[in-house]
């Protein structure tokens, strides 16, 4: 599975903070997962229900980012 470049990740995070993240309504983990899914659905789906799935648990955000970012 192709991972994201830093430029692609920047696009995802821009979308998070402009369109997806609403504190008190949508958690950051949900917003990040949804943004990745919007642009890269296969990549997001490959991490669903894994130890890196941050949709339900914000403590997994760093693991999600590690899994999607091509370092």
For each predicted feature, which ranges?
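C-terminal alpha-helical interaction appendages
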Residues: 1-71
